[in-house]
Amino acid sequence: MSYLLRLVVPDRPGILGAVATALGESGIDIVSVDVLERGGGVAVDDIVVDLPPGRLPDSLITASQGVPGVQVESLRPFAGPLDTHRELELLESLARAAEWTAVKLLAAELPRVFHSGWAVVLSGDGEGLCEVLAASDAAPTFDGMTVPWLPLSSARLLPSEADWLPERWREMAIEMMAAPFGSPRTAVVIGRSGGPAFRRSELLRMVHLIGIAASVAHLPPA
């Protein structure tokens, strides 16, 4: 079974090699490594690994944290192969789709691009009430909810402890980030339950992708 391991590691040469060695000695294969961000002497890495049959996920944590200075921020099951060209494929699909289907396609595919749990596209009425234009599988219900940040002028992180969230959502530690889609009254929200919190680098990546997607989705189909 595949897992997505998010590590906070010392930003020094050889550290990923040490992690790879520790995992390999435990019979764990690394599928891919994605450096999310670095600064302040540390780096944040997403590592997709294959866990051998019969091994417990805890063995990933034990092996990783056996390397001095390495901390496991999160461990989640990972469904599907990592595709470094997925963003380009999404944009190409949006270019071929009619505008109304492009929104649904965007919501369906973004969770795979960002290794998140779900995505929704919301439309606001200017007073905080929202309507769901499209939603991926596993997305919670936003219809009729008051979201004080909509209209949205710029992308932002939406932490799980925010006061506007339903109590049930706070208990589930639902982490989100949002970006305008075409106009301040329409926003794309990407979320994951139980964390980890989205990083600033993930938000910047979202801004870039959604900005291009908004332009592509509003063009006539190719």
What are these regions (language model features)?
Residues M1-A95:
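A conserved regulatory-domain signal marking ACT and ACT-like small-molecule sensing domains
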Residues L88-L91, V103-A107, L203:
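Hydrophobic, well-ordered secondary-structure segments
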Residues L122-G191:
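GAF sensory domains
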Residues V216-A222:
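Short alpha-helical interdomain "coupling" segment at the junction between an upstream regulatory sensor module
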Residues E99-A138:
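Helix-loop-beta substructure at the N-terminus of cytosolic sensory domains
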Residues F198-A214:
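Amphipathic alpha-helical "output/dimerization" segments
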